[in-house]
Amino acid sequence: MKFGQARQWGGVAQSLRFLWNPRSVRKSVSLFAIGAMLSVTIAACGGNNASTSSGSKDVELTLVGYAVPKAAHDAIIPKFVEQWKKEKGQTVTFTQSYGGSGSQTRAIVDGLGADIAHLALAADTDKLVKAGLVNPEWQAKTQNGGTVAKTVAAIVVRPGNPKNIKTFQDLARDDVKWVTPDPKTSGGARWNFIALWNDALKRNNGDETKAKEFVAKAYKNVVVLAKDAREATDAFAKQGQGDALINYENEVILAKQQGAKLDYVAPETNISIDTPVAVVDKNVDKHGTREVAEAFVKFLFTPEAQAEFVKLGFRPLDTATTTKENTDKFPTVKNLATIKDFGGWSEVQTKFFADGAVFDQTIATDKQ
């Protein structure tokens, strides 16, 4: 790679904001980068009394999330604060913490006092259920089963797509090398793996033996199996490794909005990457914030809030945002699977990502 190209892709690396483990971030992290960052959004002057009774007392909410939806939250929160102030006469202050979904989940389990959790996958929310922090019926209690934003898997390619990569099948070609995080350490990488698995099943009439053969061949072409998505981004964009990188489509769109010059493909056979939001029941009852926390979660599903998610690259979730103007912005996905098609995250985690499961078998085949 020429020096000029390296500088260009270095800029892209700064723009592509993935999930990653905050311990991997050592230096030069901006306020919009993905690390374990803690920022406070002040709605208005006042104290931070946790009471949720209507009146002059202020209330503070702690919103903990994986890093990707931060920009959307930053746009949505002031709208909710204004509405709540008008309806209840209360000033709401948000403390926000963002980082890798897995690390944020562990932090909540270990005592980070989240009132609301917006994580990368329902499997992480289920860990909060197992820890006794979230009601086991959280999906039934939350609109749309808790899914508040959705995207698909995208293949980021070199400028002009010189290898003519169009589908996940192309990642198994002998002339294609690619980069991805390790599904054993990265929540986002688990979506990547399932996207490839889904594609292989669809092409082979549900034959899991052939699907295993495909993913094994594809992962044999992985030049960097990074511990987290930030490391994968750096390997692809800064170090020039590989011909392709799998990322969330919304992240690529957001990077392009911020000036990054990059190309991507959204394969027509894809997986719906559904990100859940939940009230952390034990904490809201402890803090006395249930009323406002539940109201904020409900607000996230309003057309006004959903429009902000769509502006930042998430695919339309409801009928109000599923307009021709919005849908025309996205490449057509003709065959879209959901995690429910594979039994839900609990079953997927056991079948694919537990020790000795399908992913480990894939890597073992790769090493043979």
Q: What positions do the PLM features span?
A:
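Ligand-binding pocket segment of bilobal, Venus flytrap-like solute-binding proteins
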Residues: R203-T269, P276
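Extracellular/periplasmic juxtamembrane helices and adjacent flexible linkers that interface
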Residues: R17-W20, S30, V284-Q368
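Short helix-loop capping/hinge motifs at secondary-structure junctions, enriched
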Residues: G160-K166, T185, N198-G206, N283-E291
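Sec-exported extracytoplasmic/periplasmic mature domains
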Residues: P78-K86, V109-G113, A122, V129-L133, ...
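Ligand-binding cleft/hinge of the Venus flytrap
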Residues: K79-K88, Q169-D234
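C-terminal motif of bacterial Sec signal peptides marking the signal peptidase cleavage site
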Residues: T41-A44
